Each structure stands twice: as C-alpha cells, then as structure tokens.
Amino acid sequence: LSGINGEMRPGIVHRIDKDTTGLIIACKNDKAHNCIAAQLAEHSITRRYIALVYNNFNVDEGTVDANIDRSKADRKMMAVCPPYEGRTAVTHYKVLDRFPAHAQYKIPMTLVECKLDTGRTHQIRVHMSHIGHPLAGDDTYGIKKDMFAGKGQYLHAAVLGFTHPSTGERMEFSAPLPDYFEETLKKLKS
C-alpha cells in the first residue's frame, strides 16, 4: 500500500475507539482501499454496534441527530455542539433488551443496537451520554464511580457490511460479543 491514511496504518480504512471491541476493515491494496473508503464516504457501509448503557429507554427506537465537535472544556474529549458548529453526526438506536435495577447492579440497564449514518470520533459514546444513557465501562463519557470500570467499555462493533471491491458482491460480517460482555449480560438476566 502506498501509505494511504498514513504510513503507520497501512490498509486501515476506518477506526474504532480504543476500548471498543469488534470488526474493522483492512485492505490489502490501494484499489481496494480507495473503493472501501469511497463506500464509507457515501455511507453505503453497514456498521452496527451493540452497546450496554445505563438507564432504561422509554421508547424502543430512535435517532440522535446532533453535531459533534471537540469539547471546549477538554480538547481530548468530543461533545455535542450547536447545529451551526462541529460536524454532522447521526446515530440510530434500537432497544434489544431492558434490565431492571439488580441486586449487584443498582441502576437499570439497556442493551441497544446502534447504527451509524456518520462515523465521528466517539460518536456513539457522546450521543448516548447526551441523551442520558452513558455506556457502561466508559471512563470518559460515562458515569462517575462506574461499577463496570476496568473491564473496558461495553461497545462492540458487531456487524460490518460492504460491497467487495473486486467482485461487486455485497458482503456482511459479524463478530460475537467478547466474554466479559456476555458474562455481564448473563448476570443482568439472572
């Protein structure tokens, strides 16, 4: 590869946050990289994430359409900003399961699937926190004294779909939840 996207990341088309688990796309040559990057720009790549968030939703699905930019208070963080600032960011969410407050976990939790129209830095984490549902284990945008701290944030890139650069075939891949995520869900269901 000719160093597209930087010499330190040959073939990597997009990123996921440091403590997010799951799928990313890596390309083996420039042609594939350019094709996949174009699909990403056209929003034709399917990206679905599974997240465990605090508090229960009172709706089964919805959309967060709120611009994101660097936080004025802390430049290492992102934040929702007024519509005339930052960059467009759209996250669709669907409730997969709701968990009431539990003997071990004192706060109600919700398992959601998030689908991105855009792919801004920390987008799901910022949007979920913005609407009152911070991610479990997220020490940046989450709640203080998070009972899941130290295990990693509960955000998993579960599904990636795209058109193959050479064959034109639509392909979709999925990755199972990591063990710590599955174990927590079992405890919440008990």
Residue map of PLM features:
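RNA pseudouridine synthases
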Residues: 1-190
